[in-house]
Structure formats: structure tokens, C-alpha cells
Design a protein with these regions (language model features):
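Hydrophobic, membrane-facing alpha-helical anchors
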Residues: 1-10, 31-33, 154-161, 204-210
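Membrane-embedded catalytic interface detector for glycan/lipid assembly enzymes
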Residues: 1-72, 76-99
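Short juxtamembrane and helix-loop transition motifs at transmembrane-helix boundaries
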Residues: 7-17, 33-39, 163-169, 188-194, ...
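Alpha-helix capping and helix-coil boundary motifs
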Residues: 22-24, 95-107, 111, 226, ...
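A diffuse structural propensity rather than consistent per-protein peaks
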Residues: 26-27, 68, 146, 165-168, ...
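Membrane-interface helix-loop junctions at the exits of transmembrane helices
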Residues: 40-46, 157-163, 244-245
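Hydrophobic alpha-helical segments
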Residues: 76, 182-274
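Small-residue-enriched transmembrane helix-hairpin modules in multi-pass membrane proteins
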Residues: 87-208
Length: 274
């Protein structure tokens, strides 16, 4: 539930960005959030911050502003700097030190090599969980038959899933395996689909891809039609990007509660204006 409450901040920034008309305020908001997220990344977890910044930068450069060659060049330069920064954080985390000072010192030292290779290597690790799912299901653990997604829906109510053993073990299915197998494994929506539906999970992948396309369309058309709907599509997109390396239960609670709060505020403001 704490993660759900923290997600309200991220959702609020996206809503605020969509509501801004002044370019200076947009730039100031982007700078402050970018600085804050980068500082938070140096303390450890990077995935959620990176996923959020991807959506936020996309909104700022390609939705809220007119696309120009200069802005594209700026995005490319920012991506290169981001690769270096994230790789430096990963290198620092493997040692005994941590923090923004150590990360900046490493970046300035010139000791980092094969930065892009290391960054691309992170994508390969996403298949580890899928490989484990294919290898051990159903040989070691039985198919979930959709229990992971049922658990995700029920997880909207805090602490309930923990009281139902067969749902609890399905939330992170790899925890049913010996510790030596799942140690340091991240999540994977592909692995979760296979665990639940075997190769029929391919159909689920197509559905998720179609859904992501709908979200992007909602964001792109939001400025001409419905800014609130576009903001909500962007909020869901941050969770969906994390879903690639996560589990269904990771996003359901925070998305539903965020939608509930936004709906309450919207209803209150609408009633107040009439």
C-alpha cells in the first residue's frame, strides 16, 4: 500500500504537466522531477525511476511540445548521458560505496568501458525469468491457470492475498522454486504468462501489445481531445513499462487506487464548478 501512495506523486506530476500551458513551468517541472529521480536512483532501485522518466520525457518532447530536429538531438544526447549514468550506478552498487558523489566520480574517472554493451546486456537478463518458467513449469511447479491475475485483482484490497495461500504463492511464481534457482531473478510478464497458460500465453502477449498501442494513441490524441484521458493513459504506461520486468500484482493496486483518487477529485471539482 505504501508503493501505491508513493505512486500518487508520479501520477500527480503527469496530471500537472498535462494541465500546464506555460512552457517555462513545463521546463521547470521537468528539470526538478528529473533531478529528483536521478538522485533517488543513486540510492539503489533504478527500474521504476527509468520507466517513469521515459514516459515523462516522451510526454514533454513529443506530446506537450512541437517536435523539432533540435529537440530530437537533445533527446539523443540525453539518452547517451542516461546510459552512462545508469551504468555508473550499476557499477557503484556492486561495490561497497553508493550515492551521487561516488557515481559522479566514476563517470569522471574514465574507467567505464563498453557502456552500451553493458546497458544492452540488461535487456537480456529479462529472459532469465522466462527461461526458468519454461524449464520448471510444469516439471517442478504446476501451471497457475490464471491465479496470478486473480491475485492481482484481489490485491486491490490490502493484505487479503497474503491470507489465501494458493494466491499468495502465485503472485511471484518463481518463489515456489528452490532459492538457488530464483535468486536475483526479476519479474517477467512473458514468464508469468507461460506459468499461467503455457504457450497459449502468446495470445496474452498480443493482447498486451494491442493495449499498449491503444495507450499510445490515447496519449498522442489527448491534446486535441481529452487531456485527462491522455494523462491517465500516460499513468498506466509507466506501470506497463515496469510490467515487462515485473508481475501483474505489482501494478494493479497502485493503478486502481490512483484511478479512485483521481475520480474522487475530478467529481469534487466538477461538482464545485456547477
Amino acid at each position: 500500500m505504501i508503493q501505491s501512495i508513493a505512486f500518487f506523486f508520479d501520477a500527480g506530476i503527469i496530471l500537472y504537466l498535462f494541465g500546464l500551458k506555460e512552457k517555462k513551468k513545463m521546463r521547470a517541472t521537468l528539470f526538478v522531477v528529473l533531478l529528483y529521480k536521478c538522485l533517488m536512483m543513486t540510492t539503489g532501485a533504478r527500474q521504476e525511476k527509468v520507466a517513469y522518466l521515459i514516459v515523462l520525457l516522451y510526454l514533454y518532447f513529443f506530446v506537450c511540445n512541437t517536435v523539432t530536429v533540435g529537440k530530437i538531438a537533445m533527446v539523443v544526447a540525453g539518452c547517451v548521458a542516461g546510459f552512462i549514468f545508469i551504468s555508473a550506478i550499476g557499477t557503484v552498487r556492486t561495490g561497497s560505496s553508493s550515492g551521487i558523489k561516488d557515481v559522479l566520480e566514476l563517470m569522471q574517472s574514465g574507467q567505464m568501458s563498453n557502456i552500451f554493451g553493458s546497458a544492452l546486456g540488461e535487456f537480456g537478463s529479462a529472459f532469465d525469468t522466462l527461461e526458468v518458467a519454461v524449464k520448471y513449469t510444469p516439471a517442478y511447479i504446476t501451471y497457475g491457470y490464471g491465479t496470478s491475475y486473480l491475485a492481482g485483482l484481489i490485491s486491490i484490497i490490502p493484505l487479503v492475498v497474503k491470507q489465501i495461500p494458493f494466491l499468495d504463492k502465485a503472485t511471484i511464481f518463481v518463489h515456489q522454486l528452490p532459492g538457488g534457482v530464483y535468486f536475483a531473478l526479476g519479474g517477467s510478464y512473458l514468464g508469468e504468462l507461460y506459468y499461467n497458460f503455457s504457450w497459449l500465453g502468446l495470445i496474452g502477449s498480443a493482447i498486451i501489445g494491442k493495449f499498449m498501442g491503444k495507450l499510445n494513441l490515447g496519449i498522442v490524441l489527448s491534446k486535441q481531445h481529452n487531456a485527462l484521458y491522455g494523462a491517465w493513459c500516460a499513468i498506466i504506461s509507466t506501470a506497463m513499462i515496469m510490467f515487462v520486468r515485473g508481475y501483474f500484482t505489482d501494478m494493479m493496486q497502485k493503478l486502481v487506487w490512483t484511478y479512485f483518487i483521481i475520480s474522487l477529485i475530478y467529481a469534487y471539482l466538477k461538482r464545485r464548478s456547477t
